[in-house]
Amino acid sequence: MYLLEEFSVALERTFAIIKPDAVSRGQQGEILSRIHKAGFKIIAIKSMRLTKEEAGGFYAVHRERPFFGELTDFMSSGKIFALVLEADGAILKWRDTMGATDPKNAAPGTIRRDLGTSIGNNCTHGSDAPETAAFEIGYFFSGLELI
C-alpha cells in the first residue's frame, strides 16, 4: 500500500518576471491570465522599473557573460512585473508554462512561443532551481510582503 504523499509534488514558490518587452506591448494581462489558468497562486506582485544597477545585481551571475550589458540595458528599459508564484512543483511548472528561452524552440501554447519575438524579447523570466528562487524572491520582496 502506498501513501498519497509518495506521489505528490511539493508545494513550492518560484519567482517570475513579466519583462519590459511584454509590458510595452500590453501583454501583462494575457500573461497573468495564463498564470491563473495554469493553477498558480500569486503570492506577491509589484510593478516597477529597474535601474541598470538593480538589473545588474539581479543578473550578477551573468556578469562575465558577453550579453550582460545588453541584458541589463533591456531589463532597465521599461516597466516590469515581479511575481512570487505558488503551486505544486512551481519551479518546473512555471518553466513549462513559459516555454523554451528562444520562442522559435518553445512548444506551441507556451507564453514565449505565443507572445515572444526573440531570445532577447521572450516576455518572461523564471527561476531555475529552489536556491535561485529563494535569492530572486528575496531580491524583490521582503518577508513582510509575502502572504
Predicted regions and their residues:
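Non-catalytic terminal and connector segments of soluble metabolic enzymes
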Residues: 2-147
